[in-house]
Regions:
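Conserved N-terminal phosphate-binding loop of PLP-dependent enzymes in the Aspartate aminotransferase
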Residues: 1-375
Length: 375
């Protein structure tokens, strides 16, 4: 059997990592400023994380949700306290797409409605409901297509108000920052108006913080810069250092009942041990503060750079839109400077490094950028 060929891969195979450094099987060293799509939030091989996961594996790796698992309760308590959502409840699953699926389902159960409002440029996942609210027809099969989803432009309050005025929508779903679209940030004012419109029309507000959450922007959730709270918040990527996990933070106004949601693997012992360790490192090492400081430094160094059309981002969720003549810069950073970055289209380089990226690594990137873009 061969692999089903759906991934465009670099011909590089990392075999070990420490902090923000990776080594391939030839021993070549790389600076990792992408973290496997914002997953590696505390760096590769953090000692506290390794100890927690290996220790749990020796004890018990998995049992289903047919029994009590105190690690789930510990994770919920820590996540609630650190995120500022301590009065909410946590449903654990296995990925960001699954978290969004369950959030959409909860919103529909809660409101008795079926329609969902989403935004141009949105990416919420590749499974049934999640891909239906993703603004990319090329990955939406006929099976996933539905008349129940409407897309409107980001930051267009009037368009949202027109759609919600009829009281037909179960939910509005929005990313804290649009990642795949190229680091597009909804304005604080727009998020505040969105919250107000949802309240007025009885519509659930879902904040997809799968990529933009877990401290990446310098706040635990990106939407907290706007001073709002969502009814449902979805999380996944930065939660557990690469061990599959996802979650939905659920408002107290939503009623739980046995069988309403469910999962076999969600909230298993290994995933919870990993997620608890990640939160302990984030809190213990003040990684929210570090992410905010380092993000400001990147902006000071690169905003206005001759190669840049626009610098976008908050904290360590950064989009560098280059001018047309620098379209191949990401590949040059990888092959000439051995620096992993992400992309959104041909001209946006995405930086999603570990939240504990050292200043030395940040300077290494800026020096490499300047060297490759100098006249």
């Amino acid at each position: 059997m061969e692999l089903f060929d759906v991934y465009k891969r670099w011909n590089i195979e990392p075999v070990s990592g420490r902090g923000s450094i990776l080594w391939d099987k030839e021993g070549t060293e790389y600076l990792d400023l992408y973290g496997g799509h914002a997953v590696i939030s505390i760096g590769h091989g953090h000692p506290h994380y390794v100890s927690a996961v290996s220790g749990q594996l020796v004890q018990l790796g998995f049992y289903s949700n047919a029994v009590r698992n105190h690690l789930q309760e510990t994770l919920a308590e820590k996540l609630g306290r650190i995120s500022g959502y301590d009065d909410y409840r946590l449903f654990l699953c296995n990925s960001g797409a699954e978290a969004n699926e369950n959030a959409l389902k909860l919103a529909s159960f809660h409101t008795g409605r079926s329609k969902v409002l989403a935004f141009r440029g949105a990416f919420h996942g590749r499974t049934g409901g999640a891909v239906a609210v993703t603004d990319n027809p090329s990955i939406r099969s006929p099976f996933n297509a539905t008349p129940n989803v409407t897309f409107v432009p980001l930051d267009d309050t009037a368009a949202v108000e027109r759609e919600l005025s009829g009281g037909e929508y179960a939910a509005v779903i929005i990313e804290g920052i649009q990642g795949v679209a190229g680091i597009r940030i909804p304005s604080d004012t727009f998020l505040q108006e969105l919250r107000s419109l949802c309240d007025r029309t009885g519509t659930a507000l879902i904040l997809d913080e799968v990529q933009s959450g877990y401290g990446r922007t310098g706040r635990f959730f990106a939407h907290q810069w706007a001073g709002i709270r969502a009814d449902l918040v979805t999380v996944a990527k930065g939660m557990a250092g690469g061990i599959p996990i996802g979650g939905v933070l659920v408002s107290p106004s939503f009623e739980a009942s046995y069988g309403l949601l469910g999962t076999t693997f969600g909230g298993n012992h290994i995933a919870c041990a990993a997620a608890i360790a990640v939160l302990e490192v984030i809190e213990g090492e003040d990684l929210l503060g570090h992410a905010e400081r380092l993000g400001k430094w990147f902006r000071e160094q690169l905003d206005g750079d001759p190669a840049l059309k626009e610098f976008r981002g908050r904290g360590l969720m950064i989009g560098l839109e280059v001018k047309p003549e620098f379209e191949g810069l990401r590949e040059r950073l990888l092959h000439e400077k051995h620096i992993f970055t992400g992309a959104s289209g041909a001209r946006v380089i995405r930086l999603l490094p570990a939240l504990n990226l050292r200043w030395q690594g940040a300077r290494q990137f800026v020096d490499a950028w300047k060297d490759l873009t100098k006249a």
